[in-house]
Design a protein with these regions (language model features):
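Positively charged n-region of N-terminal signal peptides that target proteins for export
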Residues: 1-4, 8
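A periodicity- and composition-biased signal for non-globular, repetitive helical segments
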Residues: 8-9, 246
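Hydrophobic h-region of N-terminal signal peptides that target proteins for export
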Residues: 10-18
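A composition-driven surface/loop motif
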Residues: 19-526
């Protein structure tokens, strides 16, 4: 039943009221709106759904949200900036974003010190009228405060946090969980291999994809595996069977790409392990990631997604996603980690960006069970169907400080740190990556870009919960890392501020010991 909610100071239902500050108290299926001070604000209340519009541009509109509702929302549209303080709020929406920000300027959401606030969404079916996220922002978004903010998205197509522009996070304890499925799969489109500047194989109808094999005037339009003739599918299955028979066991005599763990291509097949599984590196099957076939999904349930840049300055951020295509943190224009503790676990890329990813001082644990742990897809790089074909020598990943643990447990060709042949720069910090990788081919620094001595451990056997320790020449322990899964023949990129050129070091773990000398800024250790 529709009810008009009376504010303590003003009565508002589709009429213009005067206020600068607004308090909204949710109570079950009702919401009570209290206004104070004067400004041009229009408030509409329908049950526990509150819509606020303000034409005031010069003042930052201040809102306080408190109480609890299992079927409520806030829709906010102001011409100026706004600040929303969450003060012990528990708000669930049964359809669409419980916090829907239509602002044309930045909105700050503050978790009040000492409070626990939980925002949830259970369905995102009406994508025309409601945006598919717990927090959906049209403009820049700042998440801050000394309290806790829990973001829970259980509905199909529902993301955790989605912004069309930049997202900044600082101080807050932020926990993001998504568990719904995506809304379908897009046909796979192949954009061509990087190469000729005068054309190639662009995407159909897209003249911006100019790389690829030079001279090719045409293009390769998107295709769907279901459209492939049955006889061709049978040929694929026969190829799979022959590979499995030929490559059963060790494949060290088979060659393959230089530096691949195991020296060659491992068997095709289901390569998506659960926690604790032990696998050997290899190509995934034709339906999975890697060379076998990339997937693009409609409304994949990502944790934090921005079409702009994501910057994390401080705070404690935990992100958990669980379904195909659901990347943990995605910033189309880059991601910057300046500080804080960040823990991301995803079946897809844990951290993904369409531009440079910078690590300047945070403690970051990025873990993927089915793809790369950290994946930067800048302009240029390797296999441009997944990026752009404009060649660009700007760094894809820069590590200046902090701790970066990037762990992919799926096997080759997925990596801990993946930048597709674009430059990877290491200037400082502690790094330990885990992944099947592609050896020395794409995602390692050079002697020029390794400002801090760095090694690539090729073929280290990662065993679940077994400590990996690094010692200097005097047997002094430098660092210890424990991985929560097993992976045979990992290609692990490792650096530490204690590493010095000319120094000798030893890596030890159960069943593995390797001593090496840092004769160059970047050293591959087999």
């Amino acid at each position: 039943m529709k009810k008009i909610v009376m504010g303590v100071l003003f009565l508002c239902m589709g009429i213009v009221c005067s206020a600068e500050d607004i308090t909204i108290r949710y109570n079950g299926d009702k919401a009570k709106v209290q206004l104070s001070k004067k400004d041009s604000v229009q408030v509409t209340v329908n049950g526990a759904s509150v819509n606020i519009e303000s034409s005031y541009q010069d003042h930052k509109l201040s809102l306080r949200l408190t109480g609890s509702s299992d079927d409520g929302q806030l829709t906010l549209k102001t011409k100026g900036k706004a600040k929303i303080t969450l003060d012990g709020l528990t708000l669930t929406s049964q359809e669409g974003a419980p916090i829907h920000l239509k602002n044309k300027k930045k909105v700050e959401i503050v978790a009040k010190k000492g409070t626990v606030n939980t925002l949830s969404v259970t369905a995102c079916n009406d994508t025309v009228n409601h945006k598919g996220a717990v927090i959906w922002a049209k403009d820049k978004l700042l998440l801050s405060g000394k309290g806790t903010l829990n973001i829970i998205a259980t509905g199909d197509g529902c993301r955790g946090i989605k912004s069309k522009k930049d997202v900044t996070i600082e101080d807050v304890t932020l926990n993001v969980t998504t568990s719904g499925n995506n809304l379908g799969e897009k046909p796979f489109g192949f954009g061509g291999f990087p190469g000729g500047p005068e054309g190639g194989f662009p995407m159909a109808g897209d003249s911006t994809m100019r790389g690829g094999f030079p001279g090719g005037p045409g293009g390769m339009p998107p295709f769907n595996f279901d459209d492939i003739p049955e006889e061709v599918k049978q040929q694929f299955e026969e190829m799979r069977r022959q590979f499995e028979e030929r490559m059963a066991g060790d494949s060290t005599s088979l060659g393959g790409f230089p530096g691949f763990p195991g020296g060659g291509m491992m068997p095709f097949g289901g390569m998506r392990p659960k926690d604790g599984d032990s696998i050997e590196g290899g190509f995934p099957d034709f339906g999975g990631g890697g060379f076998g076939g990339k997937h693009k999904y409609v409304a994949s349930t990502k944790g934090i997604a921005s079409k702009g840049k994501i910057t994390i300055n401080s705070g404690t951020i935990t992100v958990r996603t669980s379904t195909p295509g659901a990347e943990g943190i995605e910033g189309k224009e880059g991601i910057v980690f300046n500080g804080g503790n960040i823990d991301v676990l995803s079946p897809d890329d844990a951290i993904n960006a369409g531009a440079c990813i910078e690590f300047n001082g945070a403690h970051v644990l990025a873990r993927s069970t089915g793809n790369d742990a950290v994946d930067s897809n800048p302009k240029g790089g390797f296999f441009m169907p997944f990026g752009s074909n404009e060649q660009n020598n700007d760094p894809a990943i820069i590590i200046r400080g902090g701790t970066v643990y990037a762990w992919s447990q799926v096997g080759s060709p997925e990596e801990g740190l993946d930048c597709d042949f674009a430059p990877l720069v290491i200037e400082g910090g502690e790094v330990f990556s885990v992944g099947g990788g592609m050896g020395e081919m794409p995602s390692v620094p050079t002697n020029d870009t390794a400002k801090q001595p760095t090694i690539l451990l090729i073929g280290i056997n990662i065993q679940q919960d077994e400590p990996i320790q690094i010692y200097d020449a005097d047997a002094k322990l430098i660092t210890t890392v424990t991985i929560p899964f097993s992976l045979r023949r990992s290609a692990s990129l490792v650096t530490n501020p204690a590493f010095k050129l000319g120094g000798t070091y030893t890596v030890k773990t159960k069943g593995y010991e390797k001593t090496f000398t840092l004769n160059e800024a970047f050293t591959a250790v087999r």
